[in-house]
């Protein structure tokens, strides 16, 4: 009936990269190491930034060590790039969070460093991850006929 799959960063060494996503996705070594690098919301009205939490650039304050790594640098038009960021004197990286509708669910690839943010309690990281898990659920009616 459809579900969601969230894939967190991977290296392109030793895995079948062509099988990592239902659509074309090319992993790279692109990364943003400055944890204070400015984040731009490319798709501010996208569900992943609005339900159940309204994600703003403030949610990226207090991140530790880095923004993310192994961002894809090429992908199918089935994906929507959600964020843009870059280190000083680098080009913008737009592959840190990619969302694609797939069947009745969603496929999400993220290179964001949640594994660094969760242990130190970065609330914005938790809020964004909750949204990734909740995508597609905004208009679901529960078993009692009550719309969430």
Locations of the language-model features?
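Extracellular ligand-binding/catalytic regions of CAZymes and related secreted enzymes
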Residues: 21-26, 32, 58, 70, ...
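Catalytic phosphate-donor-binding core of small-molecule kinases
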Residues: 65
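Sequence-pattern detector for short linear motifs
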Residues: 16, 68-70
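A glycine-rich, often tryptophan-bearing local segment used as a flexible ligand/cofactor-contacting loop or short
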Residues: 1-62, 124, 128, 134
